[in-house]
Amino acid sequence: MDDFLKKDLGCLRSGDLKKCGELICEICRDLYTSGWVTGTGGGITIRSGDAIVIAPSGVQKERMELHHLFVMSLITREYMRMPALRLKPSQCTPLFLAVYTLRDAYACIHTHSQEAILLSTLFADSDHFSATGFEVLSYIPKGSKNNGFHKPTDKIKIPFINNTAHESDLHDSLQEAINLYPDTCAVIVRDHGIYCWGDTWQDTKMNTEAVEFLFQAYLRRRRLQKPE
């Protein structure tokens, strides 16, 4: 990184916000490697107290670096740090703020997985994805881990919302889905991807992995089932 890019890390220079930023860069690479995001798609935010660190729009996820990141105050909703490169804030930001407000989450991940898109077609006539009989359900919390986890015999329900031309326009329908499904830790955007959150960044990462694994297992099991 040259001196121009180094000159103003500001509140990302040290402490908890820097750790959040470093985690975001690492998780972005993990999401890319897993195939859950491509190019500049998807998004992630991690919270530290009353501040949130957010990955920007326009940067390839596997190339994300600390100096690319935004920092926002949850109280004032104003940016505490903006990148020197004049990058655009993530269009996911209003949705991240809704998750922080409604669920008191400490992180949120937005993926663009193919499985979420395929499930949108399979469940075209339903307002939610449902599944039962998978061991991975025991790793998915009922909204928050404080409420316990699903059992493999439970029938999990993860709501769908319809996609829009602009990410920020999903805000109202995301809020509605979160309120209608208190036991969910994720929302599926039809033909687009998912938003997944948790009580910590670790929980958010594990919840996302568990939900994406469930989607993959569900689709593979359907392919193995004989037609009636």
UniProtKB/Swiss-Prot annotation:
It catalyses: 5-(methylsulfanyl)-D-ribulose 1-phosphate = 5-methylsulfanyl-2,3-dioxopentyl phosphate + H2O. Its EC number is 4.2.1.109. Pfam families: Aldolase_II. The active site is at E135 (proton donor/acceptor). Pathway: Amino-acid biosynthesis; L-methionine biosynthesis via salvage pathway; L-methionine from S-methyl-5-thio-alpha-D-ribose 1-phosphate: step 2/6. One of its GO terms (cellular component) is cytoplasm. Keywords: Amino-acid biosynthesis, Cytoplasm, Lyase, Metal-binding, Methionine biosynthesis, Nucleus, Zinc. Substrate binds at C92. It is found in: Cytoplasm; Nucleus. The keyword Heme does not apply. Binds 1 zinc ion per subunit. GO terms for molecular function: methylthioribulose 1-phosphate dehydratase activity; zinc ion binding. PANTHER family: METHYLTHIORIBULOSE-1-PHOSPHATE DEHYDRATASE. HAMAP family: Salvage_MtnB_euk. Catalyzes the dehydration of methylthioribulose-1-phosphate (MTRu-1-P) into 2,3-diketo-5-methylthiopentyl-1-phosphate (DK-MTP-1-P). This is Methylthioribulose-1-phosphate dehydratase. It comes from Schizosaccharomyces pombe (strain 972 / ATCC 24843) (Fission yeast). The lineage of its organism: Eukaryota, Fungi, Dikarya, Ascomycota, Taphrinomycotina.
